[in-house]
Amino acid sequence: EGSGGSGSSGNFTTGSNVRMSSVTNTSNTGTGTSGGGNSAAASGARHNAPPVSVTLTESLLNK
């Protein structure tokens, strides 16, 4: 039970971080001036993409 609880907490934390990243990406896109920055952010997002997809789905289900 303890490990299960930890897993849930971890997922929630990841969801918060993902949301922050999304907001940051939106800001960068709106600026449009930081082209290189967007590229770097994109590569970082790709690595986080697989777990993020699951987290986003879980977040929607929780809501």
Curated annotation (Swiss-Prot):
Transmembrane segments: none annotated. Residues 1-63 are annotated as: Disordered. The keyword Acyltransferase does not apply. Its main location: nucleus. Phosphorylated with a circadian rhythmicity, probably by the double-time protein (dbt). Phosphorylation could be implicated in the stability of per monomer and in the formation of heterodimer per-tim. It is found in: Nucleus; Cytoplasm, Perinuclear region. Keywords: Biological rhythms, Cytoplasm, Nucleus, Phosphoprotein, Repeat. Residues 54-63 have a biased composition (Polar residues). One of its GO terms (cellular component) is nucleus. Residues 9-31 have a biased composition (Low complexity). The keyword Repeat applies. GO terms for biological process: rhythmic process. Essential for biological clock functions. Determines the period length of circadian and ultradian rhythms; an increase in PER dosage leads to shortened circadian rhythms and a decrease leads to lengthened circadian rhythms. Essential for the circadian rhythmicity of locomotor activity, eclosion behavior, and for the rhythmic component of the male courtship song that originates in the thoracic nervous system. The biological cycle depends on the rhythmic formation and nuclear localization of the TIM-PER complex. Light induces the degradation of TIM, which promotes elimination of PER. Forms a heterodimer with timeless (TIM); the complex then translocates into the nucleus. This is Period circadian protein. The gene is per.
